Amino acid sequence: MRYSGAMSTLLPFRSCLVLPLILMTLGACATQVELRMAAQQEQFAREAASQGDWAQAMRSYQAAVDNVALGRGDFAWQAHLHHQAGRAASGACRYDAAEFHFRQAIALAKKSEYSSALSYKALIEQYERQGKATQALAVRNELGFHQSRALGAFADRESLPVGKPCGVPR
């Protein structure tokens, strides 16, 4: 059998076609792993919140947010997780983190056409609890007149966690 130069280039050419498919498959597996981890972290966060361990809930929700972002999860889920992380941060008296998470939830909700009303309500409520009426009014003004009045429909819906006031030893 004679040696053919064409045969020696065919194998590397085939591997160039197969390698991207393998990499895409591995990428899809990694994405699924990240999303499963996010769901597990969300469950841990819910359990911590149900026990009043707001600091642990906040950390678990943050881990879930990070995993959903790595797994390229949808914006609605990310918005939900940020909202819950904001609630947990508020319960842990971490108002800076709570504001960040509520703002992220609002921004992501707008991208996904998911309702941002609960996050707006929580942010306003947090400012009011802190005695920051000016900031609460500014958030209401972001909404506009009709949307701000529509928040009244959520009066009986979830609010921020109620526990010992911040600054009181647990």
Predicted regions: what they are:
Residues 131-170:
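Terminal, low-structured helical/coil segments at or just beyond the last alpha-helical repeat
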Residues 63-68, 104-108, 144-146:
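Amphipathic alpha-helical segments of tetratricopeptide repeats
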